[in-house]
Amino acid sequence: MSTATATGRVTQVIGSTFDAEFPEGQLPKIYNALTIQSEHKGVTIDLTGEVQQHLGGGRVRAIALGSTEGMMRGMNVVDTGKPVSVPVGKATLGRVFNVLGQPIDKRGDVQADDYWPIHRQAPPVNELSTNTELFETGIKVVDLLTPFVRGGKAGLFGGAGLGKTVILTELIARIASSHGGYSVFAGVGERTREGTDLWLEMQETEIGSTGRNVIEQTCMVFGQMNEPPGSRLRVALSALTMAEYFRDTTGADTLLFVDNIFRFSQAGSEVSALLGRMPSAVGYQPTLATEMGALQERITSTKQGAITSVQAVYVPADDPTDPAPATAFGQLDAFIYLERSISEKGIYPAIDPLASNSRILDPQYVGDRHYTIARRVQTILQRYRELQDIIAILGVDELSEEDKTIVHRARRIERFLSQPFLVAEVFIGKPGEITSLEDTIRSFEGICDGKYDHLPEQAFMYVGAIEQAEEQAKKMESK
């Protein structure tokens, strides 16, 4: 930990930004952390800021990483001489932090041996790993149509209330509970209640049959929606730095969950406006692509280890062409698009099987059988979607026999893509189902071949493998 290099004074406070003046020749570098510790009329101020601009004449403009309430001109500002640094290593496991790496779980200080700055370069190209391997999740629609890449990045795109956080929580419960490595969760600008629920859930979920809880292999970093934009902008970098340590020093496979990457862009927009930059399209910051690229390029797999990332992406007004989700979209290996019309049918997860995709849904990576079945499923659903207008006007009876069969099977496929989740057991009254990739492929192959045309549509709702649909059909007949 280096010592302070210079002391200046606050000259201006505007919202979540402040200006400070330093002696000649002692100007802090861009991204250096500044600290203000003061007490005035019984109000104690302990604030950290980050230098964003040099204004000339020894003045800098900084973004506050905490509340500026009570700040006054003339207060002393100390340049720490380095960027914000967070604790890294095994001492962080099981703990909950804020953007500065300070524990917020009321369990005492963190005895970390090392601290890393949150601003780091992405690994050089010659250090990157080029292996491509499917990462099985046990969720049918994901494994069949949008397979995740081990060491890759997957995005959950969706509007408000479509279940992004539920799917993300489910993936944590499934992957982290069967995963031997470390997990890092970044709560970026989302609800504090959801973060608390997740923390409590992780304390109860076991890692396989090891007898240990998921939280023991996880560290969590929060910058929630009630916090200043500077905190929400930098919290993803703090979490990523902790994940990078596990990747680079232990060589372990690391999982990085981010909820929500849109809030990162949103916070950047607020900071940009406070710094006086000219807004770009739809009011976003002109540096949107640069900031997103700098973050996403660090989330990668190297020869030392892998970071597999799952990121929730809020889609404003259900418009996927909005610059924030569109910028994130280009950085991902797999993208899952949540559709409101599917949610309205009561089918969850409300994943659109036609709009979602993955770069490894290719025979070269998943094999011919998997690829063929996935494309057959999508072809049937696509034809069903094309027939919707005709059905709405004329009814199913006016279709050809071939189209009637397609509609018949598409409705069963649509319902079979639903699945009971582990984290939703208390809401739907059914135990969560983890379906193996082989069972998923075999089940959909049977539906496409017409082996289960005799089963009622409702039997396919919220089951795992096809055998459960057959059991459900028998129960329905006996009633």
From Swiss-Prot:
Record field: catalytic activity: ATP + H2O + 4 H(+)(in) = ADP + phosphate + 5 H(+)(out)
Any Pfam family the entry gives: ATP-synt_ab_N
EC class name: translocase
Organism: Rhodopirellula baltica (strain DSM 10527 / NCIMB 13988 / SH1)
Family: Belongs to the ATPase alpha/beta chains family.
Membrane topology, as annotated: Peripheral membrane protein
Keywords assigned: ATP synthesis, ATP-binding, Cell inner membrane, Cell membrane, CF(1), Hydrogen ion transport, Ion transport, Membrane, Nucleotide-binding, Translocase, Transport
GO cellular component: plasma membrane; proton-transporting ATP synthase complex
Known role: Produces ATP from ADP in the presence of a proton gradient across the membrane. The catalytic sites are hosted primarily by the beta subunits.
Protein name: ATP synthase subunit beta
Keyword Heme listed: no
Subunit note: F-type ATPases have 2 components, CF(1) - the catalytic core - and CF(0) - the membrane proton channel. CF(1) has five subunits: alpha(3), beta(3), gamma(1), delta(1), epsilon(1). CF(0) has three main subunits: a(1), b(2) and c(9-12). The alpha and beta chains form an alternating ring which encloses part of the gamma chain. CF(1) is attached to CF(0) by a central stalk formed by the gamma and epsilon chains, while a peripheral stalk is formed by the delta and b chains.
Superkingdom per UniProt: Bacteria
InterPro entries (UniProt xref): AAA+_ATPase, ATP-synt_VA_C, ATP_synth_F1_bsu, ATPase_a/bsu_AS, ATPase_alpha/beta_chains, ATPase_F1/V1/A1_a/bsu_N, ATPase_F1/V1/A1_a/bsu_N_sf, ATPase_F1/V1/A1_a/bsu_nucl-bd
Cellular localisation: Cell inner membrane
Family annotation (Gene3D superfamilies): 2.40.10.170, Bovine Mitochondrial F1-atpase, Atp Synthase Beta Chain, Chain D, domain 3, P-loop containing nucleotide triphosphate hydrolases
SUPFAM superfamilies: C-terminal domain of alpha and beta subunits of F1 ATP synthase, N-terminal domain of alpha and beta subunits of F1 ATP synthase, P-loop containing nucleoside triphosphate hydrolases
Gene name for this UniProt entry: atpD
